[in-house]
Design a protein with these regions (language model features):
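Active-site-proximal structural scaffolding
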Residues: 52, 74, 90-94, 110
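Carboxylate/His-rich catalytic cores and anion/metal-binding grooves
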Residues: 49-57, 98-125
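Segments forming glycine/polar-rich beta-alpha architectures that bind adenosine-containing cofactors
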Residues: 83-89, 94-95, 100
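Acidic/polar, glycine-enriched structural segments that form the non-catalytic walls/loops
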Residues: 1-86
Length: 125
């Protein structure tokens, strides 16, 4: 995915990128490896309560899929990627409720979330 922040013509850049991508099986293998690595560092285990385990894993999954791995100037929207409410707005409490997971499991990503606040500080004033 390209936007006008990165390139002059996002549609053309996307078409060009498609010609250089590996095969679907190769992409699938990379995808699986990336998720294995993410779960290796971010999983939270709850013994003796399967329902709680599933709920926590679902929550961690939502945070991982919405986290801005690629960009220090965006943050996690209020309903992550699973809801349309709030139209992608970022709220003040991201750092209170979401940042702790990333501080302990994905420190570089935690830095990205804090960088978002730094980059938007002038607009907040």
């Amino acid at each position: 995915v390209y936007t006008s922040r990165e390139v002059e013509n996002p549609q053309s850049a996307a078409r060009s990128k498609l010609t250089t991508l590996p095969s679907y099986p190769a992409c699938w293998e990379q995808h699986k490896q990336a998720w294995e690595a993410a779960w290796d560092t971010s999983d939270i285990l709850i013994e003796g309560d399967t329902q709680a385990q599933l709920a926590v894993r679902y929550s961690v999954f939502q945070l991982l899929i919405a986290a801005p791995w690629w960009d220090r100037q965006v943050s996690i929207p209020a309903k992550t990627l699973s809801g349309f409410g709030y139209r992608g707005h970022i709220f003040w409490d991201t750092e209170i409720f979401m940042l702790p997971l990333f501080i302990f499991t994905q420190p570089e990503l935690a830095r990205h979330l804090l960088s978002y606040r730094y980059h938007t500080l002038e607009g907040a004033r």
